[in-house]
Curated annotation (Swiss-Prot):
Its main location: membrane. GO terms for cellular component: plasma membrane. This is Ion-translocating oxidoreductase complex subunit E. The chain crosses the membrane at residues 18-38, 39-59, 69-89, 93-113, 128-148, 182-202. It comes from the Bacteria. GO terms for biological process: electron transport chain. The gene is rnfE. Keywords: Cell inner membrane, Cell membrane, Electron transport, Membrane, Translocase, Transmembrane, Transmembrane helix, Transport. InterPro entries: NqrDE/RnfAE (IPR003667), RnfE (IPR010968). Its EC number is 7.-.-.-. Part of a membrane-bound complex that couples electron transfer with translocation of ions across the membrane. The keyword Isomerase does not apply.
Length: 231
């Protein structure tokens, strides 16, 4: 198995930032009331992850170890500011919807964790790919959780997609079933905690079943060595 395949498996499943590392839970639980918000935050996090991993990998040999964390945070903050200005300019409605959680990407442990644990120790290509896979894995968790909460709470999917993609995206909105009164438990933070717990439980069940299907290797018996004298 190549290193790229291993990085992809780690980011998407085995070491998923949301389901395994349980990092970035604050924005993950707060803004996933709709698929649109989940996609917007996931896209922003993905851009920052890839950019920060690349820049940290480039400067890793020039930054003293004693000040590496402040330097990494400054790099991440610069990228987050750039992404924030980009969303403010081209998706203002989404910018208002995400609110404070957009600049708080700076403190997201997923990003600083990958910068410290991976990008600071690997080359540019591997670091960029790691950021991409971790970002996609985190975004997938956001989207699945957002879809479940929106579907249960409002009976819709892609509500407000025009905030992210423009007026043409209004055609993407799907009314799966008619909801007279929104199911507030799904839309509020308690529903996010319950949904996240179900996702983690589902992953654990899948992992357990996959492990059970693997052929069990039987250890070879070890021959005993006689240590007593024979008279």
């Amino acid at each position: 198995m190549s290193q790229y395949q291993e990085i992809a498996k780690q980011g998407l499943w085995h070491n998923n930032p949301g389901l395994v590392q349980l990092l970035g839970l604050c924005p993950l639980l707060a803004v996933t009331a709709t698929v649109t918000n989940a996609l917007g935050l996931g896209f922003a996090t993905l851009l920052v992850l890839v950019g920060s991993n690349m820049l940290v990998s480039l400067v890793r040999d020039y930054v003293p170890k004693e000040i590496r964390i402040p330097v990494f945070v400054m790099i991440i903050a610069a990228l987050v500011t750039s992404v924030q200005l980009l969303i403010n300019a081209y998706a203002y409605g989404l910018y208002l919807s995400l609110g404070i959680f957009l600049p708080l990407i700076v403190t997201n442990c997923v990003i600083i964790g990958r910068a410290e644990a991976f990008a600071s120790r690997n080359n540019l290509a591997h670091s960029a790919f790691d950021g991409l896979m971790m970002g996609i894995g985190f975004t997938c968790v956001l989207v699945v959780l957002g879809a479940g909460r929106e579907l249960l709470g409002q009976g819709t999917l892609f509500e407000g997609a025009d905030l992210l993609l423009g007026d043409w995206a209004k055609a993407l909105v799907m009314q799966v079933w008619q909801v007279d009164t929104p199911f507030l438990l799904a839309l509020l933070p308690p529903g996010a905690f319950i949904g996240m717990g179900l996702l983690i439980a589902g992953k654990n069940v899948i992992d357990a079943r996959l492990k059970a299907r693997q052929p069990k290797t039987q250890a070879e018996p070890v021959a005993r060595v006689r240590i007593t004298k024979v008279s």
